[in-house]
Amino acid sequence: MFHSVQEYVSKCETCQRTKSTTLKPTGLLQPLPIPCQVWDDITLDFIEGLPCSQGKNTILVVVDRLSKSAHFMSLSHPFSAKTVAEKFINGVVKLHGMPKSIISDRDPIFISKFWQEFFKMSGTQLKMSSAYHPQTDCQTEVINRCLEQYLRCFVHQWPRKWHEYLP
């Protein structure tokens, strides 16, 4: 069965256009400690540069490090730290409570004074990934890649309708 699936995928035109190849990461990886509880430790990232769909062109990706469960929220560029915080509260905190720690890249939103104070007041620890080392937050990068491939497969003919297919 494995060979049948492999052969089918190798001949699928949509798969060939939208799927990316994966490579083994270079160097020694130092994994982050495993969280103890679901939605206590999360990661945040943006997928930017999307075509405008219903006025939105960015996706905020929030991933739970333990369960690998994710939330995707669309945003309009330009957005502020306050707008992102409101989306985060309405889309994640209301459902799962406030996390104990957040890992994110060094996006200007995540290093803004507002964002720092917001999480300081809530008792959430902010952790930044190393500059130019996305493998620190590899799990979110994998989720981003999967979401991008999913959207490409469904909207390759109508790229301005990605918002309708956002899970």
Over which residues does each language-model region extend?
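Integrase module of LTR retroelements
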Residues: 1-167
